[in-house]
């Protein structure tokens, strides 16, 4: 699967600290690999969006929008309503320099050494933000020089509003760079252990080649990825089956198996008994 690099791959001038794009498509995509070169607001207008990152994943509809820290992620875009022909999102890109300049200009206080925070933030629309997004749509139709001047004002307007309504957590997260590569790797694995991502997708989120990912995995977990993820899924299945009302037929697909028989066989190999026997004990 090709990797999309944003905003570089869009037909816009993106050398400035701020740029905008009215993204519309009639095609859905599933777990598209995306490299965000800048921090990005995705103001969803039509459709459904799901994003996987190294720290968290989220799913939104047109009632919400996302702030995503620059880096790598997987994106799923779906057209949800039958009367809609397109998926549509207004993308507002900004680099860290734009944010730092804003902080200095406005004397914004924030925690400089934050504890681990998400790399994706979700916000719900309100009346002010709905009007704000409409103004971005209008700006996106203007020529580049006019856009660049107006976006500086719109960026400050947006950040001021979000700080006053949401606090500064999102700013702290944007400015926090992960120092420990091992921590980053473990976060990717632990957060996605039940998400049924391929090794290629996981290595992408970990910012590694597939061969390096396998090597690092063996070093950290002393086993192969396939065996470790299998064990994690089966442990999760055992936890779910502690609820006597849960049947093996209810969970085998959630655990990542294509058939009930394969799930039962794998469960018996690990625990020595079938899922049904496990529940009876």
What is each model feature region?
Residues 30, 106-133:
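Aromatic/histidine-rich interaction motifs
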Residues 1-14, 30:
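A short, N-terminal "cap"/entry segment at the start of jelly-roll beta-barrel domains
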Residues 63, 213-217, 262-263, 267:
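Short hydrophobic/aromatic patch on the recognition helix
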């Amino acid at each position: 699967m090709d990797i999309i690099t944003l905003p570089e791959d869009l037909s816009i001038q993106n050398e400035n600290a701020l740029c905008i794009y009215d993204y519309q498509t009639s095609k859905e995509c599933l777990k598209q690999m995306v490299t965000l070169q800048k921090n990005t607001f995705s103001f969803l207008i039509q459709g459904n969006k799901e994003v996987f990152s190294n720290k968290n994943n989220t799913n939104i509809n047109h009632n919400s929008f996302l702030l995503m820290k620059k880096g790598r992620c997987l994106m799923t875009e779906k057209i949800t309503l039958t009367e809609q022909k397109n998926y549509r999102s207004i993308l507002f890109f900004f680099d860290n320099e734009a944010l730092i300049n804003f902080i200095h200009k406005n004397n914004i206080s924030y925690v400089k050494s934050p504890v681990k925070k998400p790399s994706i933030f979700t916000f719900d629309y309100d009346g002010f933000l709905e009007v704000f997004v409409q103004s971005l749509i209008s700006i996106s139709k203007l020529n580049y020089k006019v856009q660049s001047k107006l976006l500086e004002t719109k960026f400050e307007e947006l950040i001021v509003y979000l700080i006053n309504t949401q606090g500064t957590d999102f700013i702290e997260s944007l400015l926090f760079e992960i120092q420990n590569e091992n921590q980053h790797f473990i976060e990717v694995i632990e957060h996605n252990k039940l998400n049924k991502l391929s090794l290629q997708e996981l290595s992408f989120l970990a910012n590694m080649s597939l061969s390096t990912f396998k090597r690092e995995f063996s070093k950290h977990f002393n086993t192969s990825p396939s065996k470790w993820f299998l064990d994690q899924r089966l442990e999760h299945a055992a936890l779910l089956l502690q609820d006597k009302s849960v049947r093996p037929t209810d969970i085998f697909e959630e655990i990542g198996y294509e058939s009930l028989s394969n799930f039962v066989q794998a469960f018996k190999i690990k625990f020595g008994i079938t899922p049904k026997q496990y529940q009876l004990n």
